[in-house]
Amino acid sequence: MSTDLDLADGFSDVPPINGGVNELELDMRDCGGVVRIHRFSRTRGQADRAVKAGRAIRMLPGVVADAGRADDSRVKMQAIHMWHRDAVIIGKAALVAQGVIPPGSRTRDFSAVHEVEAFSRTRGIKREGILVHRWRVPRRYATQYRDVPMAIPEASVLLLAVRGEWEWVCEALRQKLVTPRSCRSARSCLSWKFGRHRITAALADISFNPWSVPELWLSRALRAVGFTGWHSNTRVDTAEGAFTLDQAFDAERVGVEVDGRCVHGTPEGYEATMMRSASLDRHGWRMLHITPTMLRQRPRFVLEWLAQRIHKRHRPKVMMSDHELSRIMLGLTPT
């Protein structure tokens, strides 16, 4: 009864749910803390008693999980798979399972996922921490991951982008699980669910290839006022190594870096930033350093400062107010 998903992710180490070993406990150990209980299952009585005693919970109809592991997203994924074999995991849980390190984490931490999403052609259900949509997503956008059906990463990224959950989208792009091009090729996976304009807008932002939300803000602002001649996350080779610039104006050799405190504010980050700027300066690049706070509070100042450093042909024809730019950066006003 074991599956590759549980054993590979350490599901087998489940504590006993009572003082003695019984068939239900053995099944839970084999299946990573969750079991399917049919009407005539030999362990149905044991499951009823365990639920009544608070040692197990009914996670989904016919699916019982160890109460001590019920919050584990991997257990929820396994429960969905046991409940309906055709259900396809999508969203944050799928991205973490496929290798994405969640925002703010240093490891592939499933605890960052508070709700596991899936879709099925024939069933839909909502329980605490579980949401299964009744969607008819084309099968070509689903794949097998350790015996559990999961949506391809591009489908999950596009879903999160349409919803505005850009921290996860940026991490998937930064960690190169997806690319703007691969996301464009999957645009029809949700075209029946969301309007064409919403998907087009999400893909337009993904095309910037932002690796952080502040980078996305800056890209939206540059596009809105009409800057030209720039590219996001451009690789520059120098004698000291290769560096990736947040925004680069190749003709002027002007780069823009959005320096956040969590990375650039540490002693190691500060030293790396200084060495990086010096190396790029030796290579003929002029670097402009801004912070997310500057961009959020004074976006017009940032854009006017940048405009002074580039050729006239690449400058915007008009400039917007801070209020207008802020709404555009946050995605409240379409561009």
Q: Where do the model's predicted regions map?
A:
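Short gly/ser-rich loop at a beta-strand->alpha-helix junction or flexible surface loop bordering the NTP-binding
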Residues: 1-194, 311-335
